[in-house]
Amino acid sequence: MQYWGKIIGVAVALMMGGGFWGVVLGLLVGHMFDKARSRKMAWFANQRERQALFFATTFEVMGHLTKSKGRVTEADIHIASQLMDRMNLHGDSRTAAQNAFRVGKADNYPLREKMRQFRSVCFGRFDLIRMFLEIQIQAAFADGSLHPNEREVLYVIAEELGISRVQFDQFLRMMQGGAQFGGGYHQQSGGGWQQAQRGPTLEDACNVLGVKTTDDATTIKRAYRKLMSEHHPDKLVAKGLPPEMMEMAKQKAQEIQKAYELIKEQKGFK
């Protein structure tokens, strides 16, 4: 009820013997209270809507990416299940993710339309958009190879989300470097991806932070702080990341932290 503030304001004014002007003041104060409460309720509703859309779109696009290679195999489904495990999805959340994955596999899935809708509810929150794209990149090469069709789908996603080819290619390099810190995959010379077999290098660490090995300490620290802020799990959830995906944000933040520690050690700064 959006008029309780007015009722309480008038009641308090009458109890205090405020007279006509006291009642008017009580109405005004109560109206302001009701308006603020209404805005707060609308914010929570929009937040839930944004999180629900992020969740559904994430798994729909995963399904679309998988189908872009051709027939969806048991191995593809197993990989999707592993990603759900990484997000600690169980019960209703897992069922919702599986249903969304199936929706995305449809031949007529409207990818561009879905991406425009997703971008509109993000309200320019680049960290949310970035997290979404990073999840899709992980899903695309989780089977050990980045199929040309998957790459084309990723290019469409990036384009509709306002990310240039240059930015996208940088994201790929950052994911490549991050694989050495998170037990994932690294890029082969042929353009595919394979499971990491070596330890992380200074170049890997710099790729994670999006810096060069020749950059100075100030530049590296600035990049590190920016990335940690953009991947802060609580901040991302507050902006619309579904709570179920907080674990992936934590894992990404850990990769960034490990990369930064390696850079500090090898370049000799604190």
UniProtKB/Swiss-Prot annotation:
It is a single-pass type III membrane protein. Its main location: membrane. This is Co-chaperone protein DjlA. Residues 1-6 are periplasmic. InterPro entries: DjlA (IPR023749), DjlA_DnaK_co-chaperone (IPR050817), DjlA_N (IPR007791), DnaJ_domain (IPR001623), J_dom_sf (IPR036869), TerB-like (IPR029024). It is found in: Cell inner membrane. Residues 204-270 form the J domain. The keyword Nucleus does not apply. It holds the Pfam family TerB. Disulfide bonds: none annotated. CDD domains: DnaJ, terB_like_DjlA.
